[in-house]
């Protein structure tokens, strides 16, 4: 395997917290008084990971593949979009190595929900749970996250050329 067979991608997403929406992160519905505003289910964590996957494979970004102007994606389950992104990355000749993600939210406390998020990620990415990491952070009451106006997610993924791994 040479260095061109391994690629990394970085993803970012942010959504506003609003009344009347469910809060879904990592495919887990989290009890809270507000949820994330968006065209789909607004799962910022899965959107950041999806974006990172597309970027790593040189396939653009989430908006290119699942535009928020397309009614077909209104209310879409982001787990379905993530699985489709994985399919497209594999079609381009890559497999997922690992993912490391951070969710930044002042409230609610996310740590109790991280195991469910990791289980969903492992299932959707087709990798072992030990290759999926999710960290929950606050912003120490600073910025829009600290004011509880929104939630941010950041992700890094590693992908590798599938046939190169088979040759080793």
Swiss-Prot record:
Pathway: Isoprenoid biosynthesis; isopentenyl diphosphate biosynthesis via DXP pathway; isopentenyl diphosphate from 1-deoxy-D-xylulose 5-phosphate: step 4/6. It catalyses: 4-CDP-2-C-methyl-D-erythritol 2-phosphate = 2-C-methyl-D-erythritol 2,4-cyclic diphosphate + CMP. Binds 1 divalent metal cation per subunit. Its cofactor is a divalent metal cation. The keyword Ribosomal protein does not apply. Keywords: Isoprene biosynthesis, Lyase, Metal-binding. It holds the Pfam family YgbB. Involved in the biosynthesis of isopentenyl diphosphate (IPP) and dimethylallyl diphosphate (DMAPP), two major building blocks of isoprenoid compounds. Catalyzes the conversion of 4-diphosphocytidyl-2-C-methyl-D-erythritol 2-phosphate (CDP-ME2P) to 2-C-methyl-D-erythritol 2,4-cyclodiphosphate (ME-CPP) with a corresponding release of cytidine 5-monophosphate (CMP). Belongs to the IspF family. Homotrimer. This is 2-C-methyl-D-erythritol 2,4-cyclodiphosphate synthase. It comes from Ralstonia nicotianae (strain ATCC BAA-1114 / GMI1000).
């Amino acid at each position: 395997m040479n260095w061109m067979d391994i690629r990394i991608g970085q993803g970012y997403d942010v959504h506003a917290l609003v009344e009347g929406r469910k809060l879904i992160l990592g495919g887990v519905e989290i009890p809270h008084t507000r949820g994330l505003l968006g065209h789909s289910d607004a799962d910022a964590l899965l959107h950041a990971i999806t974006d990172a996957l597309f970027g790593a494979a040189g396939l653009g970004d989430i908006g290119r593949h699942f535009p928020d102007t397309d009614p077909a994606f209104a209310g879409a389950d982001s787990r379905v979009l993530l699985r489709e992104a994985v399919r497209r990355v594999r079609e381009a000749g890559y497999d997922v190595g690992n993912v490391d993600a951070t969710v930044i939210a002042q409230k609610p406390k996310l740590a109790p929900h991280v195991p469910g998020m990791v289980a969903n990620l492992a299932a959707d990415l087709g990798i072992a749970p030990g290759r999926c990491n999710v960290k929950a952070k606050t912003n120490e009451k600073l910025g829009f996250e600290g004011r509880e106006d929104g939630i941010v997610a950041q992700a890094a993924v590693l992908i590798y050329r599938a046939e190169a791994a088979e040759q080793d």
